[in-house]
Amino acid sequence: MIQHSDDILIDDLELFSGFMAIEQRENGLVYLRVIGYDNDMDYFINENSSLDFQNETYSFSLGYNPEFNTENVRLSYNSLTVPSTILEYNTNNKQEKILKQQEVLGNKFNSDNYTSERLFAVAHDGKKIPISIVRHKDTKLNSDTPLLQYGYGSYGITVDPRFS
């Protein structure tokens, strides 16, 4: 059902009565794959969702799924511009429903005021190192602009971008 790949790491796997949901990582990004036991489905939720996976500055994972006999899978999503969101995804009709989204204190936050992007730096050994950037959309990008930088990367550990 799942072929071996040196480029893909399986982080989590949930079994349901008619399908399995696989949380896998490739190039530092998490993808959620749905595979039906009868070979009737095999797709990535990232490609069948209204959530923004285009700018690649997100965290995405399987949520708490206590029901075995269901066609729904609970997921957790957030990005550098979207607060933590719990949603339920129907694997048959590929529709999602937001169950809960983290409230931002002060109620003045508007994600449309921010932009995020994913860039890469090349290490001495030629490996590409992902860099996630979030900024106000009006921030000037020049050498006078202050920057808060945080990073970690070793032993296969990835720091996923998260809303803060």
Regions found by a protein language model. Give the residues of each.
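Residue-level detector of Asp-centered blade-edge/turn motifs that repeat once per structural unit
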Residues: 15-17, 68-69
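Short strand-connecting beta-turns/loops that link adjacent beta-strands
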Residues: 6, 15, 26-28, 80, ...
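Inter-blade boundary loops/turns of WD-repeat beta-propellers
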Residues: 25, 37-39, 91, 136
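Serine-hydrolase catalytic core recognition
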Residues: 53, 61-164
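Multi-bladed beta-propeller domains
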Residues: 1-10, 14, 37-63, 94-112
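Structural motif
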Residues: 28-36, 81-88
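Conserved beta-propeller blade signature
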Residues: 20-22, 74-75
